[in-house]
Amino acid sequence: MQVSDVEIRPYPYPYRAMLAICSDLDRTPDRFCYERIMRFCNTTAPTPMGDGVALEVGNSIYFSMPPDQFAYWNTDSTGRAMVRALIRSGHIDTLHSFGDWARTRTEAGAALDELSRHDCMLAVWVDHATAPTNF
């Protein structure tokens, strides 16, 4: 074999393609539903939607939303602990804006302070809406 016969594969052997999937929490009503979605996507455990599909699927989180939508500030301490654990494990990897009810830089700062206080980091920001905190 000559050096010219060697090439870098675009994907690690034996794979020929890649796919990234991220769930989006829009309209998720509460921590129970959020957890069921994550369990269905990431495990083989039985869920109300059927047996889990065992994919590695990330998700997003808001901080401040109306009471009928799951967000960090409007869930209970168990829900907030779940969010922090999912951030640390990499299953929540996206800040889906600070939320529709976060209206000031002070509120955005409080969310960032909360992440920092719990040693949680989200490197991805996404917002396909018109959140007031799109400064």
Describe the predicted segments one by one.
Residues 1-135:
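Catalytic alpha-helical scaffold of carbohydrate-active enzymes acting on polysaccharides/glycoconjugates
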